[in-house]
A protein has these predicted regions:
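Non-catalytic, glycine-rich low-complexity segments
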Residues: 1-31, 106-131
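Loop/helix patches that line or flank the sugar-binding groove of alpha-linked glycan CAZymes
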Residues: 133, 149-172, 182, 369, ...
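Hydrophobic faces of well-ordered beta-strands that scaffold small-molecule active sites
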Residues: 137-139, 194-196, 240-242, 334, ...
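Substrate-binding/active-site clefts of carbohydrate-active enzymes
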Residues: 138, 142-192, 199-323, 327-328, ...
Length: 482
């Protein structure tokens, strides 16, 4: 009985539809043969002895340690008390309720306060997802490397297209016009959602070091070009998701340059996490590494000072940006970079702004680990599901785990979240942050197809990294950004 577990008002008990709850129970693997839900209205317990009415629960999946049981249940008056009748293979029969495990005897069944509760089916608290997100096939574009549609905006020193494998500071001239020119190609692929890496003004080729969040990078086009891109996407039934880098800014932003110039007297001094003035660092072995940094940064990159999202001025600034691109350009989704290093307090405000701006907006967080805290319905709809797809790659491609272990890991991830979340989790096999799938598969295109087919059949929505469809290869960043 020590493995028996349930937690009310969580992924174990949640409103799935306005009048239906999903209730889950965890037990030790291959220990329990039969589970029933005892449930009824909390105000009629003594009147009707409703605990004598039992609903069968179904074992839905297993991990290497646990079995998971589930049932869908409604309630006439939209409130529910419930407990569990559990029978093990060795003949033990127990009642499990809010106070723990008891013998399955009348005196314990009549303990009103020993039942879990869903006090009321609050529609406002139900985890809602955009319906369109469940049917989306995403295509990730690294704008600087997808297609050069307008050579007139090429940055200085641009290299001939495809002339060499990229270094960290190379430019090849990809832009938004290049995407517009290939939208029909994407439609032919079956794509109906584009996830763009950052397109805002920045110093680097990857644009994660933002200078101005309200301007398209001039090497990619301008705001009018982007507006036309969104309109052309929507004509073709393609949703548009932008990448928001709200954990940090670039060190050539006017805010950070003011801090460098004016130190603690800068009006932006509290916009960042600065531990000592003047701001300084010692260069490391490469452009993106440093040590003895006097301010907090992304990783150890001195060129990406971390934003202080506890500062109300910073919050207002970032929330204005979130609303601006939705209202002015009609984007459909935000992908949030380094989302786990920004406060929950801020993300809750961000979610409210997005919901107010557009009814069916989708929010995706970049989180590489288990993400329950962010997926309670008041922050994100989904995360980049690396924890899920890592298991697939470890089994199919790297041959590091058994099939049984892969299934266990996949099922464990599914049971961390509500059904709604699982329907829109972002199943991504490779990206601008990882080696290319074909490279991991050692050039075996048949294996690559098998992995993609298996992944695309799982719960969640697939994302294809640009160029994978033509067999593009590449090791870790920057090689994966050809």
């Amino acid at each position: 009985t020590t493995a028996i577990y349930h937690r009310p008002e969580s992924e174990f008990a949640y409103l799935y539809e306005k009048d239906k709850m999903h209730i889950r129970l965890r037990t030790a693997r291959q220990d329990v043969r039969h589970v029933q839900l005892l449930c009824g209205d909390p105000y009629t317990l003594y009147k009707e002895a409703w605990y004598q009415q039992r609903i069968e629960m179904k074992k839905i999946l297993s991990t290497d340690l646990h079995d998971y049981w589930q049932v869908s249940v409604g309630a006439e008056f939209r409130r529910l008390s419930y407990g569990f009748s559990i029978e093990s293979y060795d003949g033990l029969h127990v009642f499990y309720g809010d106070h723990g495990v008891y013998p399955f005897e009348q005196q314990y069944l009549e303990m009103n306060n020993n039942y879990f509760r869903m006090p009321y089916f609050q529609e406002a608290d139900r985890f809602k997802i955009p319906e369109w997100a469940k049917e989306t096939v995403w295509y990730q574009i690294f704008p600087e490397r997808f297609a050069n549609g307008d050579p007139s905006n090429d940055p200085e020193g641009v290299l001939p297209w495809g002339s060499k494998n990229p270094d960290r500071q190379d430019f090849f001239g990809g832009d938004l016009q290049g995407v517009i020119d290939h939208l029909d190609y994407l439609v032919d692929l079956g794509i109906n959602g584009i996830y763009f890496c950052p397109i805002f003004e920045a110093y680097s080729n990857h644009k994660y070091d933002t200078i101005d969040y309200l301007a398209i990078d001039p090497a990619f086009g301008d705001n009018d070009t982007f507006k036309r891109l969104v309109e052309e996407c929507h004509k073709r039934g393609i949703k548009v998701m932008l990448d928001a880098v709200f954990n940090h800014m670039g060190d050539t932003s006017h805010q950070w340059l003011d801090v460098i110039k004016n130190g603690k007297d800068s009006p932006f001094a509290d916009w960042f996490h600065i531990n000592e003035f003047p701001v300084n660092y010692k260069e490391g072995e490469n452009f993106e590494d440093a040590y003895d940094i006097t301010y907090d940064v992304f990783a150890f990159t001195p060129h990406m000072p971390k934003l202080n999202t506890e500062n109300p001025d910073v919050q207002d600034y970032l929330l204005k940006i979130a609303r601006y691109w939705i209202e002015e350009f009609d984007i459909d989704a935000w992908r949030l970079d380094v989302a786990n290093e920004v406060s929950h307090h801020f993300w809750k405000k961000f979610r409210q702004v997005c919901d107010d701006a557009k009814d069916d907006f989708y929010i995706l967080g970049e989180i590489w680990h288990s993400s329950q805290r962010w997926l309670q319905g008041d922050e994100f709809h989904a995360v980049m599901n690396y924890a899920f797809t890592d298991a697939i790659i470890e089994y199919f491609v790297k041959d590091e785990i058994s099939m049984t272990k892969m299934v266990s890991e996949l099922n464990n991830q599914l049971m961390l979240y509500r059904e709604q979340t699982n329907q829109v989790q972002f199943n991504i096999l490779d990206s601008h942050d990882t080696p290319r799938l074909l490279t991991l598969a050692r050039g075996d295109k048949d294996l690559m197809r098998q992995v993609m087919a298996f992944t695309y059949l799982q719960q969640g929505v697939p994302c294809l990294y640009y160029g994978d469809e033509i067999g593009l290869t590449g090791d870790m960043d920057p090689d994966c950004r050809k």
